[in-house]
Amino acid sequence: MRYTDGKVHDITIAYIGGGSRGWAWNLMTDLAKEESISGTVKLYDIDYDAAHDNEIIGNALSMRQDVKGKWLYKACETLEESLKGADFVIISILPGTFDEMESDVHAPEKYGIYQSVGDTVGPGGIVRALRTIPMFVDIANAIKEHCPDAWVINYTNPMTLCVRTLYEIFPQIKAFGCCHEVFGTQKLLSRALQDIEGIENVPREEIKINVLGINHFTWIDNARYKDIDLMYVYKQFVNKYYESGFVSDANNNWMNNSFVSAERVKFDLFLRYGVIAAAGDRHLAEFVPGYWYLKDPETVREWMFGLTTVSWRKEDLKRRLERSKRLKTGEEKFELKETGEEGVRQIKALLGLGDLVTNVNMPNHGQIEGIPYGAVVETNALFSGNKLKPVLSGKLPDNVNSLVLRQVYNQETTLKAALKRDFDLAFSAFVNDPLVTISLKDAKKLFKEMLENTKKYLDGWKIKA
């Protein structure tokens, strides 16, 4: 890398999952709008053609006169080729295909278990983790061999176990996980400020919060805007909208978009515990007993959120594949929209181009009390020149921490089971999940069925009869 006049040149970014039609395009967008950094993005994907398509799309974007950030995109045929010489590594992969995810999400429905996402916890999240962890073992070993000093940014779910695996295999790795769920809660606090106090259009970055918890089950126990206590403002907001829910856009709401909610799960958790649940309702609902919010589709509708079906994801993939073709041929112009992501800002800060405080997922080295040392937790952290320091965030209320700890220990059990290829250990995590409220006999039948549906990613496993 070269530093000149407040800019950094010749940076090398390895992108694992470089054929992505979502996260990769977001990265291209944010790099294109940032003139202070430039270099090469090496795209690796098990689908080389997809990575090559993104090479064409990215290089066409870089040549445009309206683009400030100039990057060379290069598709790589092997993981090793992409990692050699990398200063940063970005991991954004789909572990398996949507066929496996279809089993993760929908096989449990035969037993009355409903999941709104199915990629983090619940039966789907656990089985997804069992096939993801071996992939991250390989990635960690490759990083250790080819670019041990690189900063590693993970976007893949299950976030906690992906990051945890990287550190288990390569303890000296400089890795962290990024998730935008907390950003949505900052935006909700901004809307509460407008609704209750009449203060309009406050950017989420000006909403100062203390974050603590685990990914997708993150909490805020202190929130301020200048001298205004937003915990008090939020309480009034929750009391006002608890029954009706809060809908910010009538044309894009929980009834016509399964990714959107009316925030009623979030509001209910606040009234129960007095701290703000800082993730989308679809994720939060999966961390607590299933009969709270996910008893059945009717209950889900009462709480005003949606069950995201894998059939929808498959249709969406078809649309993105068609868009990829249009972008590749130039039939469609690549629009530089706001992505809402912070990866490029984090890279800049690590390069010494200004400090940044934001939420990330890292091993617990004392930043949260009451959670085991080494478990991956989500808190704020300070990014500065080649340094990342988690912010001391205190302790969750005991009644919240008991919910979090159940998931932490389950995640640790899942990791051990995946590394040992231990059916019984994995099943013990499966039946301990709050969504699995069926009999042991039915739970074992379901578990075996789900493992059978993902067995091509479970090398060395013996699925018991």
From Swiss-Prot:
- What is the name of this protein? Alpha-galacturonidase
Superkingdom of origin organism: Bacteria
Q: How does it assemble?
A: Homotetramer.
Q: Which cofactor does it need?
A: NAD(+); Mn(2+)
Task: Indicate the residues that form the catalytic site.
Answer: H180
InterPro entries listed in its UniProt record: GH4_Enzyme_sf, Glyco_hydro_4, Glyco_hydro_4_C, Lactate_DH/Glyco_Ohase_4_C, NAD(P)-bd_dom_sf
Q: Which organism is it from?
A: Thermoanaerobacterium saccharolyticum (strain DSM 8691 / JW/SL-YS485)
* Gene Ontology terms: biological process: carbohydrate metabolic process
Co-factor note (free text): Binds 1 Mn(2+) ion per subunit.
The entry sums up its family as follows:
Belongs to the glycosyl hydrolase 4 family.
Its biological purpose: Alpha-galacturonidase able to catalyze the hydrolysis of the chromogenic substrate p-nitrophenyl-alpha-D-galacturonic acid (pNPalphaGalUA). It is probable that alpha-1,4-di-galacturonate (GalUA(2)) is the naturally occurring substrate.
The organism that produces this protein has a lineage beginning with:
Bacteria, Bacillati, Bacillota, Clostridia, Thermoanaerobacterales
